[in-house]
Swiss-Prot record:
One of its GO terms (molecular function) is phosphoribosylaminoimidazolesuccinocarboxamide synthase activity. The keyword Phosphoprotein does not apply. This is Phosphoribosylaminoimidazole-succinocarboxamide synthase. The gene is purC. It comes from Marinomonas sp. (strain MWYL1). Gene3D superfamilies: ATP-grasp fold, B domain, Phosphorylase Kinase, domain 1. It catalyses: 5-amino-1-(5-phospho-D-ribosyl)imidazole-4-carboxylate + L-aspartate + ATP = (2S)-2-[5-amino-1-(5-phospho-beta-D-ribosyl)imidazole-4-carboxamido]succinate + ADP + phosphate + 2 H(+). GO terms for biological process: 'de novo' IMP biosynthetic process; cobalamin biosynthetic process. It comes from the Bacteria. Its EC number is 6.3.2.6. It holds the Pfam family SAICAR_synt. GO terms for cellular component: cytosol. Keywords: ATP-binding, Ligase, Nucleotide-binding, Purine biosynthesis. The keyword Transcription regulation does not apply. CDD domains: SAICAR_synt_PurC.
Amino acid sequence: MEKRQELYAGKAKSVFRTDDPDKMVLVFRDDTSAFDGKRIEQLDRKGMVNNKFNAFIMTKLQEAGIPTHFEKLLSDTESLVKCLDMIPVECVVRNVAAGSLCRRLGVEEGITLTPPTFELFLKNDALGDPMINESHVESFGWAKASDLAKAKELTFKVNDVLKAIFAEGGMILVDYKLEFGLYKGEVLLGDEFSPDGCRLWDAKTKEKLDKDRFRQGLGGVIEAYEDVGRRIGIDFDA
């Protein structure tokens, strides 16, 4: 597989064409951003950690019958993925109240949400990724109703699988965001799953083990990511 020209660079990953029009290479960089890209820093080993973390999680999800774009690891910082027509919407599930939910609704952090909440956000940095609803998605043509329904179904299936995996490692999956796209008409999970895009707390101490450590200036960001990975069986030195 030959990596060719760069298609685009996001906040923490770059995407490259290959000699196969149906495949792309994701390159995970050491860049770390917060507040819609207003704060950016380089954290040593982050690209490698997130690449291997994502590969592990995507493989677990595929084994559970959840279709993803992930194909295989190419190197410490590169993965081969299917080329998707992305839906410009983030699907967010919250198992525990935290982050923007607390700010918007004035609820206390740490409240268990039963059942978990499902939210949609438009991927638009200039607008601050505004919260939207399913009617907006269909009315503005961002996705067909059937494709959005499938994405929602898969988002909750992911929740069932990952809550169990992280619980075995002594952690709480507080919330997470997912992105989906179409591959030959099928809705697949795209982008990545790493501590950059979810909240994870130690089940006993409630210590934050995710990107909130960067947002809130707690330090030890990559050490926390590696701790999470080791708890669920990832060997970052392999």
